[in-house]
């Protein structure tokens, strides 16, 4: 266990990790530009984290939820861009996003999620009343079930960001 600013720490070590976890930054009132102010959430930073993941390792990033969704979906979009920049053809196969009423957790796997991992993620979320917003193969009926929002904003956002018109959604 190392408690340090992740990007700076990882640039000083060649070691690979099974899990790299980034906690939510700032308070819930940090505002629209909260992620813009931190260099730990850039495409380049995410690539640094990927470079330090063990085979089948995970990057877990927590963020505060604001409505309409901002930071969680911006982070999801950044992860997609970072994965594509490393040559990953199907970023959605390596991503999962779950949420509670006030936080979300983005999981990025070094490799595609297995069926067993998806089953475990779904069961973990169900037992704790977390909503799933994305995992490979998610169906609309599995989103927005516990902490119900007016619309399944997070599910809709992740689908749009992974779809063919992602630039229209993010732009």
Where do the model's predicted regions map?
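Soluble catalytic regions of membrane-associated enzymes that act on cell-envelope
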Residues: 1-112
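Soluble small-group transferase modules, centered on the S-adenosyl donor enzyme superfamily
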Residues: 5-7, 85-171
């Amino acid at each position: 266990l190392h408690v340090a600013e992740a990007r700076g720490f990882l640039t000083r070590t060649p070691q690979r990790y099974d899990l790299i976890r980034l906690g939510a930054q700032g308070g819930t009132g940090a505002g629209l530009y909260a992620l813009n102010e931190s260099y730990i959430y850039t495409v380049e930073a995410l690539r640094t984290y990927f470079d330090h993941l063990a085979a089948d390792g995970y990057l877990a990033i927590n963020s505060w939820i604001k409505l309409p969704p901002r930071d969680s979906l911006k982070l999801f979009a950044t992860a997609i861009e970072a994965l594509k920049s490393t040559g990953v053809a199907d970023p959605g196969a390596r991503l999962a996003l779950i949420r509670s009423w006030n936080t979300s957790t983005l999981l990025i796997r070094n490799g595609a999620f297995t069926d067993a991992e998806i089953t475990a993620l779904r069961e973990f979320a169900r037992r704790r009343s977390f909503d799933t917003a994305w995992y490979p193969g998610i169906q609309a009926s599995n989103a927005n079930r516990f902490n119900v929002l007016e619309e399944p904003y997070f599910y809709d956002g992740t689908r749009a960001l992974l779809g063919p018109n992602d630039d229209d959604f993010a732009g």
